[in-house]
C-alpha cells in the first residue's frame, strides 16, 4: 500500500469527536426555555364547579358538559314519619356547559318552588405566577330563576315579574397551597 493511501485510510478510520453529538446541546435547549418567561396558572383551586349549593371559582373547559343531580334533605329531627328528612328532600337536575375556557353556562330544574334556572359564569382574572403574575382568580356570575308554582291567591293581581328572581355574584378565590384555598362570594339577590 502506498503511503498516501495508508495515510488516507488512517485518517478515515480514526474517530473524531463530533460537536453535533455534544451532550451540552440539551443543556443549551434548557437554557433557552428558561430564558423565555413563562406563566404558570393555578389549577384545581377547588375540585368541582360547586361548593355545597353555591358556585365555586372553577370553570368547565371548552366543550365539556357536566350533568349534576343535587339533593337537599329535610331536618334529621323530623323523625321516622318523615324518614329523618328524606321525605322533605328537594332535588335539582342541571346541565352545565363550558363554551370556552373562560365562559360557562347552565340550565336546570329544581323541585323547590318548581323553579327553572339558568346562569352564566365568566372568568375575569386567573391566578398565576411567572411572566404574568395575578394573586387571585376573579369570576362574574349571573343567574335567573323562574318560579312555576300555582298562584296561592288567584283573586289578586299576580304579576309575571313576581315569578322571576335574579342573582349576581363576584367570586374571588386564591389557592394558597395544595391543601388550602379561600373563596369570597359577595352576592346580590333580587
Residues covered by each model-derived region:
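Bacterial Sec-dependent N-terminal signal peptides
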Residues: 1-24
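Transmembrane beta-barrel domains of Gram-negative outer membranes and organellar outer membranes
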Residues: 21-157, 164-168, 176, 180-184, ...
